[in-house]
């Protein structure tokens, strides 16, 4: 018999940002009080390597809407004279990271602690086959922030991703349209000490500052969460 109480929480909204979880935990704070919390939504290094996860990256998520003309236009009549919202959106998104994989938003790295020498040594000891990793996901080359290994990039460093982008004509065949609107859903993975609300504000201010005057850009925050990291033995 266990000599302690065990409480289970089964939560099915994780993929949409867990909109109900925080309020539930606040309402039932006393019921959920515990000395140790174990999260099962993590992965193993490999099928042969037992893993204990001591930290997770946080998240900030937005939807972006770029509006140009008041309706879809014919590119033969208006192309080159009116800004194309999809072109503008692609340029805005492409400029958020530089050629070295670093995020260009001013202030973004202010609260980021670099990977320590001890952490790098510990990560380097993890059994990791880069060739198998690439083969499993079907890519020939990997890309990420310069100066960091693959395992450092996907665990200890922040990142920016376009999760979805759309606009204009997307049916079969072709249509020479200059679209009225373009949309994107984007996210940043954050590391501990990066506050997702602060990052969200920095992102919104950055887009407002660099967006050209010939389109209207609206940024809508969707959800976010703090990264976490626990004390661990290194060496």
Located regions from the model:
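Metal-dependent amide/peptide-bond hydrolase catalytic core
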Residues: 45-47, 61-63, 67-235
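Internal, well-ordered domain-core segments that constitute the primary functional module
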Residues: 12-14, 33, 55-68, 86
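Acidic/histidine-rich catalytic neighborhood of metal-dependent amide-processing enzymes
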Residues: 1-55
């Amino acid at each position: 018999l266990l000599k302690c109480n065990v409480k289970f929480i089964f939560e099915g909204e994780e993929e949409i940002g867990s909109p109900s979880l925080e309020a539930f935990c606040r309402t039932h704070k006393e019921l959920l009080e515990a000395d140790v919390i174990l999260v099962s939504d993590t992965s193993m290094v490999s099928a042969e390597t037992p893993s204990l996860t001591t930290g997770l990256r946080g998240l900030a998520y937005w939807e972006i809407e770029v509006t140009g003309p008041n309706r879809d236009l014919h590119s033969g009549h208006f192309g080159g004279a009116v800004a194309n919202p999809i072109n503008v959106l692609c340029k805005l998104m492409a400029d958020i990271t530089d050629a070295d994989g670093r995020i260009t938003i001013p202030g973004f790295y202010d609260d980021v602690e670099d990977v320590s020498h001890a952490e790098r040594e510990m990560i380097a000891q993890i059994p990791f086959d880069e060739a198998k990793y690439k083969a499993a996901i079907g890519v020939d080359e990997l890309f990420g922030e310069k100066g960091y290994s693959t395992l450092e990039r996907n665990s200890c460093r922040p990142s920016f991703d376009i999760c979805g982008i759309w606009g204009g004509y997307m049916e079969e065949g072709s249509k020479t349209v200059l679209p009225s609107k373009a949309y994107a859903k984007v996210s940043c993975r954050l590391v501990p000490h990066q506050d997702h609300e602060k990052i969200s504000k920095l992102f919104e201010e950055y887009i407002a500052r660099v967006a050209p005057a010939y389109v209207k850009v609206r940024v809508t925050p969707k959800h976010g969460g703090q990264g976490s990291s626990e004390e661990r033995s290194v060496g």
